[in-house]
Amino acid sequence: MHVPQFISTGALLALLARPAAAHTRMFSVWVNGVDQGDGQNVYIRTPPNTDPIKDLASPALACNVKGGEPVPQFVSASAGDKLTFEWYRVKRGDDIIDPSHSGPITTWIAAFTSPTMDGTGPVWSKIHEEGYDASTKSWAVDKLIANKGMWDFTLPSQLKPGKYMLRQEIVAHHESDATFDKNPKRGAQFYPSCVQVDVKGVGGDAVPDQAFDFNKGYKYSDPGIAFDMYTDFDSYPIPGPPVWDAQDEGCCFIDGVDTTSVKEVVKQIICVLK
């Protein structure tokens, strides 16, 4: 078989082997192992389908299609809690995403500024990432499938209490041997999903400040976006900035404390000194 120059042999074989529908989206959130219930259009900005975003100029790159449509609830959590985002295509615990869709998974946070915020603009900080493990020759997506669509991460322990938008993103590289701007039929596939979270209780005073803008920060030339997974490689550069270090910020902050009270001011001072 003659293989056209614009597509590698490995990419063609993967294209022929994969099913027609192999996409995914987020359905639920767990806090410290407790299921918060079906989050579709409740606390998750749920897109109308499982299709990927490939255009880096699209506003849907931030929070997917319908990303600016309000949803009524927030997941309640505390700084330092373990959160689990649950992904699948149709059936819970099965049919997560096609194994050919190899790639990283990253998690981001932004201050919640408005019910209609769509995630565009310089508002995001990365709080977790996982890409390619050369020792096992496996991707984050492989781990997601093995875990039946469950992806764990921890909220920064020094995060200031308040309302936030959390964004998790899967990037699939089975067609990124060509970039979307050069060949719209191919390119890296982005699966972003945004969740409303209310961080309560005792935390720090760390406020996410990386100010990353997906439409400006992601480039078609980035080695973690224009990535040919069908060549030999032993490492992978995850797109975006490094993980935000919330520990750099500072002190304790107690949600809802009236610091006009001398007693509560003393509590704050003790918290800072710990």
Swiss-Prot record:
Catalytic activity reads:
[(1->4)-beta-D-glucosyl]n+m + reduced acceptor + O2 = 4-dehydro-beta-D-glucosyl-[(1->4)-beta-D-glucosyl]n-1 + [(1->4)-beta-D-glucosyl]m + acceptor + H2O
Q: What is this protein called?
A: AA9 family lytic polysaccharide monooxygenase A
Job description of the protein: Lytic polysaccharide monooxygenase (LPMO) that depolymerizes crystalline and amorphous polysaccharides via the oxidation of scissile alpha- or beta-(1-4)-glycosidic bonds, yielding C4 oxidation products. Catalysis by LPMOs requires the reduction of the active-site copper from Cu(II) to Cu(I) by a reducing agent and H(2)O(2) or O(2) as a cosubstrate. Cleaves a range of polysaccharides, including cellulose, xyloglucan, mixed-linkage glucan and glucomannan.
* A Pfam family this chain is assigned to: AA9
Coiled-coil portions: none
Per the record, its GO cellular-component terms are:
extracellular region
Residue pairs linked by disulfide bridges in the UniProt entry: 63-194
Q: Where in the cell is it found?
A: Secreted
Family under the similarity heading:
Belongs to the polysaccharide monooxygenase AA9 family.
Residues annotated as binding O2: 174
